[in-house]
Amino acid sequence: MTRTLKPLILNTSALTLTLILIYTGISAHDKLTWLMEVTPVIIVVQLLLATARRYPLTPLLYTLIFLHAIILMVGGQYTYAKVPVGFEVQEWLGLSRNPYDKLGHFFQGLVPALVAREILVRGMYVRGRKMVAFLVCCVALAISAMYELIEWWAALAMGQGADDFLGTQGDQWDTQSDMFCALLGALTTVIFLARFHCRQLRRFGLITG
């Protein structure tokens, strides 16, 4: 199958993420929280490198995964409630809490939605744009809900030590707002990125028509 990215670009991106991973791990505020946050990055990067030849993704998807990985690693480094740039945004917008975790949850909807869309469209598993859009949003919300369950399990297992991982910042509606941000990310995919995504799929011969 035709590669969508040159091996040099893909390998350089993986190396960049590895270096960021090492740096954030060394300087992490809490090593256990960092490990829990970056584990998905480690798994996904290995998976993408292993499948780059037989199942290459669109450059758009690779780019968004790259950005999402950085967001996760920075969140793991400081813990989401203490990311410095989040405090700057909080002050600038006059918010009551650090909003960096909401950026993470937005991408948690955006990226899985695009992954789901790419798989569904390329595999021709579903006919009809509206049904594809609906299923893409369902997948993103399901992943978001699973992540919230993982946070709950972590809270039960770790007790007070899970506060940095949960990052609720005293917000009783944190779970609901997290999932809403994920939904916004998924809607961004189906409303604003779908056409460009389809053009890339056609350009690289990943779909026909």
Swiss-Prot record:
**Chief subcellular location:** membrane
* Pfam families for the chain: DUF2238
User: Membrane side Cytoplasmic: which residues?
Assistant: 29-31, 77-131, 199-209
* Membrane-topology descriptor: Multi-pass membrane protein
Keyword Transmembrane tagged? yes
Q: Which GO terms describe its cellular component?
A: plasma membrane
What name goes with this protein?
A: Inner membrane protein YjdF
Please name the source species. Escherichia coli (strain K12)
Q: Which gene encodes it?
A: yjdF
